Every structure is written in structure tokens, then in C-alpha cells.
From Swiss-Prot:
Protein name: Potassium-transporting ATPase KdpC subunit
UniProt keyword ATP-binding, yes or no: yes
Natural source organism: Herminiimonas arsenicoxydans
Disulfide bridge map: none
InterPro entries: KdpC (IPR003820)
Protein's job: Part of the high-affinity ATP-driven potassium transport (or Kdp) system, which catalyzes the hydrolysis of ATP coupled with the electrogenic transport of potassium into the cytoplasm. This subunit acts as a catalytic chaperone that increases the ATP-binding affinity of the ATP-hydrolyzing subunit KdpB by the formation of a transient KdpB/KdpC/ATP ternary complex.
Gene: kdpC
Superkingdom, natural source: Bacteria
Keyword Nucleotide-binding appears in the UniProt entry: yes
Amino acid sequence: MKSTLRPALVLFAVLTLICGVIYPYAITGIGKLAFSEQAEGSLVSRNGQIVGSSLIGQAFSSPQYFWGRPSATSPMPNNAAASSGSNQGPLNLALIDSVKGRIAALKAADPANTLPVPVDLVTASASGLDPEISLAAAKYQAARIALARKMQLEEVQSIIDRHSKAQYFGFFGEPRVNVLALNLALDQHH
């Protein structure tokens, strides 16, 4: 028994050291060297104060700000620890009701807006934490924000254009914009 127990314990100790200590520290070190901002959470700070992460959406509800995608992490919106999609199918009555409610809220916030409501403003993403919205979703909200901030519509659209990102590799996804970056730019501008 001693002859089989000793190699098993040695193997256990060696693998614990490699997999539990050496590998995690090595990968963390490489990540911090190669991708220092991302390894630290892609935190965004303003005046020395951390205001969010560029990788995790935040809940904005003031008419003076761009609103992101709905969060699927309830009861706390945009809770990274509870990241997941809603798992509701397109025929699920709960999904249909929540989409109708979100459309009604968007229409109530900007009754003069006659544009079609972009789908990403009424449906959660697969992770439930998307920090970005489509350009259509940003432009849909531009008039409401301009009115609330007493800005020219062209100024808001210019901020959207300056912060827009192209498709990944020129063909994956669609042009998009980070909601936190837009809102910080609005605060800085006005």
C-alpha cells in the first residue's frame, strides 16, 4: 500500500503546485504584461475615480444619458456575477410582454420619435451585460438627449460618430458604440 500511496501523493502535490499556483500566476503575469488594461478589468476612470468598465454595461435611466441594452441579470441589473441570457424563446409570453413594456417606456420617454425602435434597445444580449449598442440605437436616442441637455441634435450625433466603432475585421457584427464612453463624452461636452 505504501508503494502506491507515495507516488499518488507526490503526483497530487506536483499537480496542485503546477495547476493551482504556477499556471495561474504565469497566465496572470502574461496577461498583465501583454494586456494590462484588460487584465485589470478595462476600468474607466474620470478625475481619478473609477466610473465603470468598458466591458460591462451599466444601467442608465436619466433622459440625459444614452440607455444601453436591457440587462438579463435580475434582480440587480448588469450584475457580472449573474451573467447569462434570459433564455426566453421568441414565442415566450414573458419575453413578448417585457419587449412590449420596453417599447412603451422608450416611446413614453420620447413621444415625438417616429423612428422604429432598434431591437437591441428592447432585448438583452446573450451575456446580459453588453456595454455597447448599435449606431441605430444610439441615433434613436439622440433627439431625447439633445432635448434633455438643451444641445443641438447635430452635437449629439457628432459625439456618436466620434465614438463609433467599425465591424470586427470589417465584416463581423455591426458598427457599434460603447454606452459608457458616450455618456462620459456627453458629461465632458455639456
